[in-house]
């Protein structure tokens, strides 16, 4: 957000959010900041990451075991939860289920909602328009609905965006049931780590924000 960018420009100590927190905050922060959903709402998040997200220990484990897929953090106390709760102004930790699959980098973070979770009566079109308007001036963030998402082979893949600072926020919906999934697709090593650090550095020292990205 513009508020965070301005804070970064004058800060002496800057930390880049964890990759799961990055995806979660990009979805939840606008909803709570603008009052679309109460900060007392019990958010539910599911995510999948490439195995590089676990650092050298998980990379070594995966190279030795070649596990196709696994969940972890099943004590519901993942280390990124305080970041999400603090920056999104939540009263409660989200229910968060992270997972790892057998690919090196890339990730998807999914937020599950219904149309009834919103504070005021709204439509799917208004939700899509809200996110598009909110991020319209953020060149690294693109918002799509499932009416115009082009899915390779018809599948939504977590390793579509790699070696990049880009994020796609995708909105999948069922107008009959009133259910929707708001999803962030990005590179856990890019926007979720090093590329975000470069963007912060550029902002802090007055460089072109996209320099090196």
Task: Tell what function each PLM region has.
Residues 1-67, 72, 172-175, 211-213:
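N-terminal Rossmann-like NAD(P) cofactor-binding subdomain of oxidoreductases
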């Amino acid at each position: 957000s513009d508020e965070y960018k301005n804070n970064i420009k004058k800060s002496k100590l800057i930390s880049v959010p964890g990759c799961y927190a990055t995806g979660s905050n990009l979805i939840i922060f606008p909803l709570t900041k603008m009052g679309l959903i109460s900060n007392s709402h019990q958010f539910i998040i599911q995510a999948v990451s490439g195995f590089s997200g676990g650092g050298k220990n998980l990379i070594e484990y995966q190279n030795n075991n070649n596990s196709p897929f696994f969940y972890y953090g099943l004590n519901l106390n993942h280390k990124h939860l305080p970041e999400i709760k603090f920056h999104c102004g939540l009263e409660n930790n989200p229910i968060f289920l992270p997972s790892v699959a057998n690919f090196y980098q890339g990730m998807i973070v999914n937020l599950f909602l219904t149309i009834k979770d919103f504070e005021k009566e709204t439509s799917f079109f208004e939700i899509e328009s809200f996110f598009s308007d909110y991020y319209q001036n953020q060149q690294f963030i693109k918002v799509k609905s499932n009416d115009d998402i082009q899915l390779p082979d018809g599948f939504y893949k977590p390793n579509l965006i790699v070696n990049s600072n880009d994020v796609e926020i995708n909105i999948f919906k069922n107008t009959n049931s009133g259910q929707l999934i708001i999803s962030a697709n990005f590179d856990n090593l890019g926007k979720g780590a090093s590329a975000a650090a470069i963007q912060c550095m550029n902002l802090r020292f007055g460089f072109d924000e996209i320099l090196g990205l």
